[in-house]
């Protein structure tokens, strides 16, 4: 078996870092995401607005996920623990990304995703970013302005708390 040279390994690592950095293209901070008249997994006939989904909190964790996405499935129980924590500072709202409502609803129930999950069937929400990979989590205020974002799954409750609090 042939081994990669140090130069080849460095080139592959640089390419991987470049691709990871391009997962959410463009400068997202300060961008406003419009969520209006959207259906949810729990109520496909609903026409939900971002402010309604905030549930009285000033910050929203908008999490793009799919039932097909292994890192998403690993992250959902952690987000569920955050939601169940004593005083979460943000409301979690899911966006079903490149997925159908049926598999999404099954995965949400199986993994404990009890929060509202928007059905982005036409990709209109994801196109505003644009989302190129999942999971992607945006920290929004109630006006839909992106305060911060994370590409890839959170690793701990402490990481989620630090992300929401801006530390």
What is each residue range found by the language model?
Residues 51-73, 79:
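Short active-site neighborhood of thiol/selenol oxidoreductases, capturing the structured segment around
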Residues 61-62, 92, 137:
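Hydrophobic beta-strand anchors of alpha/beta hydrolase catalytic cores
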Residues 1-42, 153, 157-167:
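N-terminal targeting signals for export/organelle localization
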Residues 107-113, 121-165:
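Thiol/disulfide oxidoreductase modules built on the thioredoxin-like
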């Amino acid at each position: 078996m042939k081994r990669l040279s140090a130069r080849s390994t460095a080139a592959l690592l640089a390419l991987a870092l470049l691709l990871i950095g391009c997962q959410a293209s463009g400068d997202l901070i300060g961008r406003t995401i419009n969520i209006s008249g959207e259906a949810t997994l729990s109520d496909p006939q609903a026409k939900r607005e971002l402010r309604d989904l905030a549930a009285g909190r000033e910050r929203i964790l908008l999490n793009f996920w799919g039932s097909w996405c292994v890192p998403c499935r690993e992250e959902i129980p952690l987000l569920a623990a955050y939601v169940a924590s004593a005083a979460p500072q943000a409301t979690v709202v899911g966006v079903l990304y490149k997925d159908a409502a049926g598999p999404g609803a099954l995965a949400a129930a199986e993994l404990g995703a009890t929060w509202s999950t928007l059905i982005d069937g036409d990709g209109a929400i994801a196109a505003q970013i644009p989302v190129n990979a999942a999971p992607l989590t945006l920290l929004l205020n109630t006006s839909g302005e992106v305060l911060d974002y994370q590409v890839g799954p959170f690793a701990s409750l402490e990481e989620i708390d630090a992300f929401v609090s801006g530390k």
